[in-house]
């Protein structure tokens, strides 16, 4: 066994002394994934993937299964926690230049895509009104693909409309994808330890490192305790805070909800999709809103890794963060002025961040007189 793997086995991996709390979200994500797999298994034991019984089986789990309400709420709110952690994790990677560890960043972006797919399939399973219509709207975007679109949509649905075969295959995919996520997470962690994690200064920390255990394990445990407390508080006192009222009604293909809305963690992508008044253009923008993260390591031009000493880039980054929140907010509103205009401007600003990133780096190099 190589020396590095032996160190990893005993938690003795050398880590920079100056990594901050923003580096704790990796271990929090690992905890979230374990929680999701465990609660998901116990829910799958009682769930029935049939359009006539799915909604009733969720009610049965909540009312009749011992601690079923706890499992169901932990799984649903745990998914929201997962996305809160992953968005902060990505933001930290963008701010501190962690994306320059290319293999780790690319595997992480692939993980995000897999996670979003898993969450989408999971949202359809209760077969509530919003579950059904969200599935209809999002899968229907495949028809925008020239030549192959209609065939692919029919193949995905298992028929000419969303029906029992669709629910069955979505359940199968929702069950199998987390195992792929766990495998890729292991690869993500191994690739990270090939080079070692970055630090807030963005400098080489080889001269100042400490063992991961006990120093950073206790630091991680503090944040894990806080996250667990927050999760249990929401589960106990505000279990429906992230739920859509429409999803408490059984799916009815004959009644369209007044306002179509996916889960809150997809709203930024949905807002970008809605901001473009063209089906194919919207579908491409939706895909690019995630895929554009893959370009970041290849467009970095600054001689400095972290944004800590780059005030212009800091302003750009926090504008990007505000834009993300604005798109999320506009996606909850009806498709009418002024919300359409706001979402279009915000969507443009979202993509401009990734264009400004290399330009600002080049300008900073000129100002600092780097060759």
Swiss-Prot record:
What is the protein name given in its UniProt record?
Cytochrome b
Where in the chain are disulfide-linked cysteines found? none
- UniProt GO MF annotations: metal ion binding; ubiquinol-cytochrome-c reductase activity
Topology relative to the membrane: Multi-pass membrane protein
Residue runs in coiled coils? none
Q: Please give the subunit comment from the record.
A: The cytochrome bc1 complex contains 3 respiratory subunits (MT-CYB, CYC1 and UQCRFS1), 2 core proteins (UQCRC1 and UQCRC2) and probably 6 low-molecular weight proteins.
Q: Which UniProt keywords apply?
A: Electron transport, Heme, Iron, Membrane, Metal-binding, Mitochondrion, Mitochondrion inner membrane, Respiratory chain, Transmembrane, Transmembrane helix, Transport, Ubiquinone
| Cofactor(s) the protein requires to work | heme b
Q: Which domain of life is it from?
A: Eukaryota
Is-annotated flag, keyword DNA-binding?
no
Q: At which positions is heme b b566 bound?
A: 89, 188
Residues annotated to bind a ubiquinone:
193
Q: Which residues cross the membrane?
A: 25-45, 69-90, 105-125, 170-190, 218-238, 280-300, 312-332, 339-358
Q: Which residues bind heme b b562?
A: 75, 174
Q: Where in the cell is it found?
A: Mitochondrion inner membrane
Q: Which InterPro entries match?
A: Cyt_b/b6_C, Cyt_b/b6_C_sf, Cyt_b/b6_N, Cytb/b6-like_sf, Cytochrome_b, Cytochrome_b_C_euk/bac, Cytochrome_b_N_euk/bac, Di-haem_cyt_TM
Please report a single Pfam family linked to this protein. Answer: Cytochrom_B_C
